[in-house]
């Protein structure tokens, strides 16, 4: 990423006399400081060469302009200090240490009278963090094409120039050339001339001008004139084959193109006392068109692409594409059969459809360029931006070994080849092979820039000594691990976790068990804020130290935080909305996530090793949305069918059956004694322990203790425990309880198991389903009250026949089940009232 707080440079089209120079990859515009609060916006696209220079160049107080990287060096091998004008230069990118200059004159302490920069080394005395956003640039000796717009499919440059991609690549990598502006339009039909195939290209020119005699000079030693032929045995030999004196010329055995490459040749041999120079001889076989072409400029490489893009008029080209589209539509309408609905010529229709697709692609590219106010020649780079050094650092390990970013090596290759190209260009015209070597060096520079931007996308892949491909700029910003998706669009932070799920039978439907270690990482920012707010930690570092040491106060703060927040549980694959739901976290000491078994159907999860991810909604808006839309009690029905999703099954149904089972019923009738004596009981801490069988005497003591605890009204007609119960052998062997709470307490204390029979006082307003059989016994007192005794209940009524006291015979498991149902219903209605 690049940052800017300078105005955008003027467009290249505004001044055609200036050197056309590149654009960049990603550019960031920052509003000026004097305009008020700092605001930044991000725009991805092309930038002009002037814009890149504005990003990188700075004017020092002494008037010197810095920002251009000239040397391919990074740091000195002995002092480990950045080299001047190199890739880590402190003059360009800022000091490594805040307030320290490179020469050592200033060492962090500055007076009010001190200058803002060092007079000796030119380093600005500012903070070192500027090395994260200050850029540099490389002035390329020859323009190079941006590989993103050349190699991607579809190729933007190929569509704009309406040339095959193969021809464009040949021109970019100096495999062919084009004629200069003076005659480009004249030879447009010839296309690009491939280097190494001049004979074929010139043959096309000569053929068009009907100069058939060229065949007498190329590809053979035999020269045919009229109907006679001779063989040239030497480099220069006189031809006297019945020709007139005015037509006799001196012919060399050299190839025609090698002779044509020399502009002036001296006379070689005397023929009938006439001096005939080679140049005159060649003109007999070459037309004036070749002479015109020979005098024009030959363009190749990125500069040729740039010149062609400059000549593009996007508006006119868009109009031309629209006309072509209308023409194709007319052709399509003429080919259509109204009856059969088929084309007359299927091959021609396929060509039309292919041409339509090309027009659509080209139109989209041109409209995007016009809308973004981007000039097409910016796709050719002549100024290459250099990323800030802290984004491509050199790190020293403990052993003293230095490791560097791959970008530094790729930048060095670009600088080395750019320097070599500038040397060969300075020798061009003075050395024989300077033109050829400069052309090869242009292609080498193009490949180096391709590797920097997208290694492997160009013609070759750059590798290190271990045959490992260098990581280019594209590799650093694309994909899941790239700068955009990982650091800008979404940052990878500790707001999510993953673990195995296990069943949590003691959890409520809206709860999930969250491991304490995982919760400590998930809610760490909230814990830090709470510690600082409550003045339990003075600063951020102290709060992190407390969390790292896991001090006891941390768990108390964490417990308070999780009470008011929901977490999201997600199980892949998330095929529908029930695949991710919100739960209230409950801290547990295990390392697995506890999940209520009723919500497993929505997740399509089971407890055979499945894993689930935990996410924390950060903002209050996200918390509210999770509580309203994603909370597990709000997702009991399937959004597809409307049927219930949270339905008990498997072990839940079996548990309900066992919980409401009477010990003397069914197959358990013969096992009641042994099962009750060694049954599993719930304790106060939700642990399970084995209870031992109590003797009859302890049972009687327990009944008496319950009688004393209940405090019955003695000698009252409304006594809670009638005297006849003690005299009836069918009743006194089972304990009597006043309400649910007494039963639950006895279960937790281990006095009852789930299958223990008991008498429970029943509210009069709830009906009792008595046995179909009649009462076992009737009892009356002096006041007229009656007691009806059944095999599973007894009811006490007044003289008017209204019942005012009821007791039912049930089990502890049924009491526990009924109490849980009533509690859930009450909690639901209380939440609705809120």
UniProtKB/Swiss-Prot annotation:
Domain of life: Eukaryota
EC nos: 2.7.7.6
GO CC entries: chloroplast; DNA-directed RNA polymerase complex; mitochondrion
Biased composition (Polar residues): 1-22
Needed cofactors: Mg(2+); Zn(2+)
Record's keyword annotation contains Protein biosynthesis: no
Pfam families: RNA_pol_Rpb1_1, RNA_pol_Rpb1_2
Entry annotated with the keyword Zinc: yes
Chain positions covered by the region annotation Disordered: 1-45
Principal subcellular localisation of the protein: plastid
Residues annotated to bind Mg(2+): 606, 608, 610
Signal peptide per UniProt: none
GO biological process: DNA-templated transcription
Keywords (A to Z) from UniProt: Chloroplast, DNA-directed RNA polymerase, Magnesium, Metal-binding, Nucleotidyltransferase, Plastid, Transcription, Transferase, Zinc
Subunit structure, interactors included: In plastids the minimal PEP RNA polymerase catalytic core is composed of four subunits: alpha, beta, beta', and beta''. When a (nuclear-encoded) sigma factor is associated with the core the holoenzyme is formed, which can initiate transcription.
Family named by the database record: Belongs to the RNA polymerase beta' chain family. RpoC1 subfamily.
PANTHER family on file: DNA-DIRECTED RNA POLYMERASE, DNA-DIRECTED RNA POLYMERASE SUBUNIT BETA
Function description: DNA-dependent RNA polymerase catalyzes the transcription of DNA into RNA using the four ribonucleoside triphosphates as substrates.
Name of the molecule in the record: DNA-directed RNA polymerase subunit beta'
Naturally occurring in which organism (per UniProt): Staurastrum punctulatum (Green alga)
Chain's gene name: rpoC1
């Amino acid at each position: 990423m690049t940052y800017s707080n300078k105005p955008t440079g003027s467009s290249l089209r505004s001044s055609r006399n200036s050197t056309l120079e590149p654009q960049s990859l990603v550019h960031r515009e920052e509003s000026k400081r004097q305009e008020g609060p700092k605001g930044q916006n991000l725009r991805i696209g092309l930038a002009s060469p002037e814009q890149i220079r504005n990003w990188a160049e700075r004017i020092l107080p002494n008037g010197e302009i810095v920002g251009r990287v000239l040397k391919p060096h990074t740091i000195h091998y002995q002092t480990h200090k950045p080299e001047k004008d190199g890739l880590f230069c402190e003059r360009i990118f800022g000091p490594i240490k805040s307030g320290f200059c490179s020469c050592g004159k200033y060492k962090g302490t500055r007076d009010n009278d001190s200058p803002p920069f060092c007079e000796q080394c030119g380093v600005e005395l500012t903070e070192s963090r500027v090395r994260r956003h200050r850029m540099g640039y490389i002035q390329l000796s020859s323009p190079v094409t941006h590989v993103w717009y050349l190699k991607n499919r579809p190729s933007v440059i190929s569509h704009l120039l309406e040339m095959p991609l193969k021809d464009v690549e040949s021109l970019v990598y100096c495999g062919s050339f084009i004629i200069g502006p003076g005659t480009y339009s004249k030879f447009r039909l010839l296309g690009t001339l491939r280097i190494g195939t001049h004979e074929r290209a010139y043959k096309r020119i000569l053929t068009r001008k009907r100069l058939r005699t060229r065949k007498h000079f190329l590809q053979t030693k035999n020269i045919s004139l009229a109907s006679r032929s001779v063989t040239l045995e030497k480099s220069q030999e006189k031809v006297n084959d019945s020709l007139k004196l005015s037509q006799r010329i001196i012919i060399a055995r050299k190839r025609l193109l090698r002779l044509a490459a020399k502009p002036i040749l001296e006379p070689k041999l005397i023929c009938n006392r006439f001096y005939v120079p080679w140049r005159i001889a060649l003109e007999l076989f070459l037309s004036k068109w070749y002479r015109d072409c020979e005098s024009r400029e030959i363009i190749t490489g990125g500069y040729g692409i740039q010149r062609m893009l400059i000549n593009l008029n996007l508006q006119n080209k868009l109009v031309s594409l629209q006309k072509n589209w209308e023409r194709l539509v007319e052709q399509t309408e003429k080919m259509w059969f109204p009856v059969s609905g088929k084309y007359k010529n299927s091959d021609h229709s396929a060509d039309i459809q292919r041409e339509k697709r090309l027009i659509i692609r080209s139109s989209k590219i041109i409209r995007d360029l016009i809308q973004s106010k981007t000039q097409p020649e910016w796709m050719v780079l002549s100024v290459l931006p250099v990323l800030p050094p802290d984004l491509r650092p050199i790190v020293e390990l403990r052993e003293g070994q230095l490791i560097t970013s791959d970008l530094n090596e790729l930048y060095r290759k670009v600088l080395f080849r750019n320097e070599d190209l500038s040397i060969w260009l300075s020798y061009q015209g003075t050395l024989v092979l300077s033109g050829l070597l400069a052309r090869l060096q242009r292609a080498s520079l193009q490949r180096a820039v391709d590797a920097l931007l997208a290694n492997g996308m160009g013609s070759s892949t750059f590798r290190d000594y271990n045959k490992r491909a260098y990581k280019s700029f594209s590799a650093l910003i694309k994909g899941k691990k790239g700068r955009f998706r990982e650091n800008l669009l979404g940052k990878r932070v500790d707001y999510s976790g993953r673990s195995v799920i296990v069943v949590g039978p003691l959890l409520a439907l809206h709860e999930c068990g969250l491991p304490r270690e995982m919760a400590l990482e998930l809610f760490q920012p909230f814990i830090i804020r709470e510690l600082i707010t409550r003045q339990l930690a003075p600063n951020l570092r102290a709060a992190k130290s407390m969390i790292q040491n896991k001090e006891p106060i941390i768990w108390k703060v964490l417990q308070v935080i999780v009470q008011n927040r929901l977490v999201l549980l997600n199980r892949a694959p998330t095929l529908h909305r029930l695949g991710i739901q919100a739960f209230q976290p409950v801290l547990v000491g295990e390392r697995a996530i506890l999940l209520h078994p009723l919500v497993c159907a929505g997740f399509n999860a089971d407890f055979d090793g499945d894993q689930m991810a935990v996410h924390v909604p950060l903002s209050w808006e996200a918390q509210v949305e999770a509580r309203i839309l994603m909370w597990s009690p709000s997702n009991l029905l399937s959004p597809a069918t409307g049927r219930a999703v949270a339905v008990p099954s498997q072990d839940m149904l079996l548990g309900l059956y066992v919980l409401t089972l009477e010990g003397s019923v069914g197959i358990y009738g013969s096992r009641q004694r042994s099962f009750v004596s060694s049954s599993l009981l719930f304790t106060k801490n939700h642990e399970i322990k084995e209870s031992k069988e109590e003797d009859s005497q302890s049972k009687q003591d327990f009944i008496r203790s319950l009688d004393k605890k209940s405090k019955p009204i003695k000698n009252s007609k409304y006594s809670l425990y009638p005297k006849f119960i003690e005299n009836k052998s069918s009743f006194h062997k089972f304990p009597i309880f006043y309400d649910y709470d007494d039963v639950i307490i006895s279960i937790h204390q281990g006095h009852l198991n789930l299958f223990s029979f008991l008498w429970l006082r029943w509210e009069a307003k709830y009906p009792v389903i008595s046995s179909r059989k009649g009462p076992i016994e009737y009892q009356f007192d002096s006041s007229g009250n009656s007691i009806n005794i059944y095999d599973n209940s007894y009811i006490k009524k007044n003289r008017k026949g209204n019942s005012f006291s009821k007791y039912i015979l049930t089990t502890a498991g049924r009491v526990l089940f009924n109490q849980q149902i009533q509690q859930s219903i009450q909690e639901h209605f209380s939440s609705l009232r809120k």
